[in-house]
């Protein structure tokens, strides 16, 4: 009796941690290239920090009573040395940690940017994932409202570069520590009047982080939050001057904004300016970028008192908008797909493919899928599906004559009567292809 073959279980990815497949990678590359060009134009330098940090970095930096620290962090104990570690839920704290550890501010302020995956343990939904990607900037050592205005305007310039519309700016000021303390006393008094109707989340926050109650999404609490004491009414002269200075700079540069007194952000390190860029095209997850000023953070993490501001934006949400507005660019194919028939032709074709790559052309060489030679027809199908501009064809007869076939697959040269296979001497192949691509591009511009 033959033993029945055991079925091997198919493994799948972790829910909320998504693969970026080849058909989507082009859109990611387009966004990354656009944002990197913008960041270079503003003089920002790239910094790359580890995915895993000591848990204390986030409990001290973000705040122990924030949702991120209380409910959303992927934390674990290192079995080797007992250290408490966390997969980064955001990257501002890590960038600040690195700037302190490596004494990066000894010679003055720094403009830094980062890009990479973040991790939060929450229920996956559209625009909200357990592994998600952010790009962000941190302007360390800049105290004035001009730095706040500059990082906000960077976002507007990025929306313009990407072609996105309908993303609106909301701003607020959280003032200084003593102003928040005075507001906190009055806010708790106000909220205590409604203790019987507050939901569990609001009750939990009432005495630990009452400011976050104003950010509630519960429809039943909207009137309570709307009529609560506003932090902006508690601002002193210094905070008010900073906020008004920001508004003047935004207005002078034609950046429309809305002052939202309930905008508080979910991280404890913010002071003075906070802002969000929001859209109504993504449902409940309408914030695509957010940030503000976090002057106390560098000192909280062991550095010298240093002013700082920055923002982070969710890449997945921006890509959703690009798709929604049909702004995703067409994926570009390679320049050449090399087809061959016969053993001798295969060897010559392989050598030619490498020589073409030496000149800077993008080339796919047809490799056998199953070890057996593929038919000419199937290879040409593969060539067309690859998106290549030209097929270069090596047959035994062509090789014997020192020639090669070239057929246009894309562009003006592939249309109508122009689309005929041409025979070209092998030694002239590179020059022929480059001239053909230039001619095709010029025809396409006409």
UniProtKB/Swiss-Prot annotation:
Belongs to the class-II aminoacyl-tRNA synthetase family. It comes from Burkholderia cenocepacia (strain HI2424). One of its GO terms (biological process) is histidyl-tRNA aminoacylation. Homodimer. The keyword ATP-binding applies. One of its GO terms (molecular function) is histidine-tRNA ligase activity. Keywords: Aminoacyl-tRNA synthetase, ATP-binding, Cytoplasm, Ligase, Nucleotide-binding, Protein biosynthesis. Its EC number is 6.1.1.21. CDD domains: HisRS-like_core (cd00773), HisRS_anticodon (cd00859). This is Histidine--tRNA ligase. GO terms for cellular component: cytoplasm. It is found in: Cytoplasm. It catalyses: tRNA(His) + L-histidine + ATP = L-histidyl-tRNA(His) + AMP + diphosphate + H(+). PANTHER family: HISTIDINE--TRNA LIGASE, MITOCHONDRIAL-RELATED, HISTIDYL-TRNA SYNTHETASE. It comes from the Bacteria. Its main location: cytoplasm.
């Amino acid at each position: 009796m033959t033993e029945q073959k055991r079925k091997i279980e198919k493994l799948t990815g972790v829910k909320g941690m998504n693969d970026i497949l080849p058909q989507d990678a082009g859109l990611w590359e387009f966004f990354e290239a656009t944002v990197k060009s913008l960041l270079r134009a503003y003089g920002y330098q790239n910094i790359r920090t580890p995915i895993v940090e000591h848990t204390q970095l986030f409990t001290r930096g973000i705040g122990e009573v924030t949702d991120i620290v209380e409910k959303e962090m992927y934390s674990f104990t290192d079995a080797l040395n007992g250290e408490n570690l966390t997969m980064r839920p955001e990257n501002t704290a890590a960038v600040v940690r690195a700037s302190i550890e490596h004494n990066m501010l000894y010679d003055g302020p720094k403009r830094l940017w980062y890009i990479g995956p973040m991790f939060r343990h929450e229920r996956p939904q559209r625009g909200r994932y357990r592994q998600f990607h952010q790009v962000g900037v941190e302007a360390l050592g800049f105290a004035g409202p001009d730095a706040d205005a500059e990082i906000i305007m960077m976002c507007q310039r990025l929306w313009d570069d990407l072609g996105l519309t309908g993303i609106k700016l909301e701003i607020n000021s959280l003032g200084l520590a003593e102003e928040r303390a005075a507001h906190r006393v009055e806010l708790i008094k106000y909220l205590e009047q409604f203790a019987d109707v507050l939901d569990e989340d609001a009750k939990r926050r009432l005495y630990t982080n009452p400011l976050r109650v104003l950010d509630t999404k519960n429809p039943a609490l909207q009137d309570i939050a709307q009529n609560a004491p506003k932090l902006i009414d508690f601002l002193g002269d210094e905070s008010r001057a900073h906020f008004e200075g920001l508004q003047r700079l935004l207005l002078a540069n034609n950046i429309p904004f809305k002052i939202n007194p309930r905008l508080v952000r979910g991280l404890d390190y913010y002071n003075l300016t906070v802002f969000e860029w929001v859209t109504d095209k993504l449902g409940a997850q309408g914030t695509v970028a957010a940030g503000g000023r976090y002057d106390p953070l560098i000192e909280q993490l062991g550095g010298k008192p240093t002013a700082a501001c920055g923002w982070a934006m969710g890449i997945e949400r921006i890509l959703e908008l690009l798709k929604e507005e049909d702004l995703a660019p067409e994926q570009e194919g390679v320049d050449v797909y090399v087809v061959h028939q016969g053993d001798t032709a295969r060897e010559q074709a392989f050598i030619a493919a490498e020589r073409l790559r030496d000149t800077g052309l993008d080339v796919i060489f047809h490799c056998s899928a199953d070890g057996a030679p593929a038919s000419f027809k199937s290879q040409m199908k593969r060539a067309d599906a690859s998106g290549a501009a030209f097929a270069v064809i090596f047959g035994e007869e062509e090789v014997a004559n020192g020639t090669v076939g070239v057929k246009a697959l894309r562009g003006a040269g592939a249309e109508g009567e122009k689309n005929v296979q041409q025979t070209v001497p092998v030694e002239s192949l590179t020059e022929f292809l480059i001239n053909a691509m230039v001619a095709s591009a010029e025809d396409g511009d006409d």
